Swiss-Prot record:
Belongs to the KAE1 / TsaD family. It is found in: Cytoplasm. The lineage of its organism: Bacteria, Bacillati, Cyanobacteriota, Cyanophyceae, Synechococcales. Its main location: cytoplasm. The gene is tsaD. PROSITE patterns: GLYCOPROTEASE. Keywords: Acyltransferase, Cytoplasm, Iron, Metal-binding, Transferase, tRNA processing. It comes from the Bacteria. Transmembrane segments: none annotated. This is tRNA N6-adenosine threonylcarbamoyltransferase. It catalyses: L-threonylcarbamoyladenylate + adenosine(37) in tRNA = N(6)-L-threonylcarbamoyladenosine(37) in tRNA + AMP + H(+). PANTHER family: TRNA N6-ADENOSINE THREONYLCARBAMOYLTRANSFERASE, TRNA N6-ADENOSINE THREONYLCARBAMOYLTRANSFERASE, MITOCHONDRIAL. Substrate binds at residues 134-138, 167, 180, 184, 279. NCBIfam families: gcp_kae1, T6A_TsaD_YgjD. One of its GO terms (cellular component) is cytoplasm.
């Protein structure tokens, strides 16, 4: 058992959590959505300044809610990569300071590994190997999870991440920011079969298509052209039907690639992580397909789909128990493959 205090500031959520192995003692998340809504997206400089304003309050709230004190905390963990460099720096500086002042071990955590570990918070008995579909505003990946720190990326996006595509299409339809929840709400009132939209396929030099990689640029362009055509009509823009058709196309495409990937690699379990894991249509299609193929699929609770520090603490706990420690000289990295997690640690 390990009691870990973790900090997450990779983008626009300031989060602090305390986790005892895989049991959440406290989970504080301060979202900046309202701050960034007027800009239609995250402004890195604004995000960093907000983290500076919020981090101490979040730390105090997490400690108070957990009922624990510093003597019980065994290690300090923080997201160090990937993410917005300035935002990451706020969390890393706070974590290093706490580690030095309270003389605790320090662990830097990969953000995507945190999303992989989010499923453990509701499924503590989950065991590798399994396939993780990681879909968020910055990432769309199919990751073969072999064990703690042992990952192989089997598929990725060649252009926009799924969450990024949702944000851009929501802006196109004047649905606001963040786009994922806005499109999901509108789609519930629409018919997903109204418009036929293209699924992104990546051509291979030898012919055929890449089975696991995604592309959303063509779908985004198709939505733009379709919307422009419909606006030339005197009829009101069918926003709900457009949202439903777009969402269903993305969900079907991701489901098809995920099922093919898990079957090709002889796996029987799928987990889903990242903000887009909250999407109702993706959950429907994946659960239906998994049942058809007699596979298990696990989604984190909605509160652990978006960025949070509980998932970071959960990942750090396994590394801590494996004897992994990070040097206090470890810096932030705005880009780092999940396959390179081992670079963050020194094994004791």
């Amino acid at each position: 058992m390990a009691i870990i205090l973790a900090i997450e500031t990779s983008c626009d959520e300031t989060a602090v959590a305390i986790v005892n192995n895989r049991n959440v003692c406290s989970n504080v998340v301060s979202s900046q959505i309202q701050t960034h809504q007027i800009f239609g997206g995250v402004v890195p400089e604004v995000a960093s300044r907000q983290h500076l304003l919020l981090i101490n309050t979040c730390l105090d709230q997490a400690l108070q809610a957990s009922g624990l004190g510093w003597p019980e905390i065994e290690a300090i963990a923080v997201t160090v990569a990937p993410g917005l460099a300035g935002a990451l720096m706020v969390g890393v500086t706070a974590a290093k300071t706490l580690a030095m002042v309270h003389q605790k071990p320090f662990l830097g955590v990969h953000h995507l590994e945190g999303h992989i570990y989010a499923s453990y918070l509701s499924q503590p008995d989950l065991q590798p190997p399994f396939l993780c579909l990681l879909v968020s505003g910055g990432h769309t990946s199919l990751i073969h999870v072999k064990g703690c720190g042992d990952y192989r990326q089997l598929g990725t996006t060649r252009d926009d991440a799924a969450g990024e595509a949702f944000d851009k299409v929501a802006r196109l339809l004047d649905l606001g920011y963040p786009g994922g929840p806005a499109i999901d709400r509108a789609a519930k009132q629409g018919d997903p079969g109204t418009f036929k939209l293209p699924e992104g396929k990546i051509s291979l030099p030898q012919g055929g298509y890449h089975p696991y990689d995604s592309s959303f640029s063509g779908l985004k362009t198709a939505m733009l052209r379709l919307t422009q055509e419909l606006k030339q009509s005197s009829a009101p823009l069918p926003v709900d039907d457009l949202a439903a058709s777009f969402q269903d196309t993305v969900a079907r495409s991701l489901t098809k690639k995920t099922i093919q990937c898990v079957l090709d690699h002889g796996l029987t379990t799928i987990t889903v992580g990242g903000g887009v894991a909250a999407n109702s249509r993706l959950r429907y299609h994946l659960q239906t397909a998994a049942q058809e193929h007699q596979l298990q699929v696990f989604f984190p609770p909605l509160k652990f789909c978006t960025d949070n520090a509980a998932m970071i603490a959960c990942a750090a706990a396994d590394h801590f128990q494996n004897g992994d420690r990070s040097p206090l000289t470890l810096g932030v990295q705005s880009r780092l493959s999940v396959e390179q997690v081992s670079q963050l640690y020194e094994r004791n």
